[in-house]
Amino acid sequence: TGLSIGVHLLNLLCIPAIVLVFYYKKFPDANLKGSLIALLISVVLVAAVLYGVVPGIITVGGWFELFFTNTLGMPFNTGTILYILLLIGSFVWAIYETYQDGSQKRQNIAFIVAFGLIGIPFVGFGWKAFFTGIVILAVTFFVLQMKRKSNVDGKKSVLPLVSARIKNTALLSMLMLIIGYSSYALIVIRSTANTPMDQNSPEDIFTLGSYLSRDQYGDSPLLYGQAYSSQPAIDEDGQHYKFSKGAPVYERKEKASSDEKDSYFVVRTKDKIQYEQNMFFPRMWDNAHAGQYEQWLGGVTGHDVDGVKMPTQMENIRYFLSYQCNFMYWRYFMWNFAGRQNDIQGNGEPEHGLSLIHI
């Protein structure tokens, strides 16, 4: 999983299959309930890696970089280098403590330090991410401190709720993620050479964050958001569109003289425009492709929402199934396993570019 982060994030989809294999091997009498629980655990693991480790290391590393550069006036990348050293050192300490299985207090403190430095608890940006992370770390420490009663062969004892073995396994797993994550160092090294293809120019912790979050491709609403016909919300002053404030984007400040200290400044924030009309699971959301949406569905009847014709949820789902699932997924899938109809570029026609058994 760690190395897969540096290859392609879609490799994370192997986690549910691996969890199920482990579950079926560990529990021969597996049932539907256990399988669903295993799948739920796998979803949590994928989310922890995708929304925790991947952006979390950038978040915490960015805090270190800003503090040492903007506050203490030290050169660029000083905070990043120190953060990497502390991250590695914290994992070495935590793995050693859990392997020795000595003081429970030292084990738990070392685990919390490593867990915090890898950035999983710090979801979001700014002070919100900081306080959210503190709460998650506090809850995690409380759980690690909990005890359970044990009765083996008539001998009663009190043991930690989370054993040293479990903590050690978790730390080793996170360490493997870090080792895989380190493959992105090649991107930074390549960018410093100023190659012709240098998207986002990831030469520091902040531009690397933009590269990893794929800012150059934009984003789209997933579970809830606007449709292609939605109108922007107007601010209270009646003069501007309404925006939701996003994370700040830092860039290196150009020096006016060689005596000036290195520093970062906020060049912009990742604000998102808000819309008056929204819907659940919006698949037809881009107003630049309104004509293509209606052409694919053979026309959109829609329904009126505040004077705006919005696609119905049924039309939205029909587009999702017919285009995104059938045409854009199953067609390519069956190219690999059944063969191509022909090599002519298809745009939805029944005689161009489908698979041999396409419906």
What do these predicted ranges mean?
Residues 1-6, 115-124:
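Membrane-interface alpha helices of multi-pass inner-membrane proteins
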Residues 357-359:
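Conserved small/polar residues in nucleotide/adenosyl-binding loops
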Residues 168, 172-342:
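Aromatic-rich transmembrane-lumenal/periplasmic boundary elements in polytopic membrane proteins
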Residues 1-18, 24-29, 167, 287, ...:
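Membrane-integral, polyisoprenol-dependent glycosyltransferases
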Residues 10-22, 55-59, 129-137:
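Transmembrane-embedded, aromatic-rich helix segments that form part
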Residues 44-65, 94-98, 118-123, 175-199:
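Membrane-lumen/periplasm interface segments of specific transmembrane helices
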Residues 28-40, 72-82, 100-111, 126-131, ...:
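Membrane-interfacial entry segments at the cytosolic side of transmembrane helices
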Residues 20-29, 92-101, 142-151:
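Structural signal for the C-terminal ends of transmembrane alpha-helices
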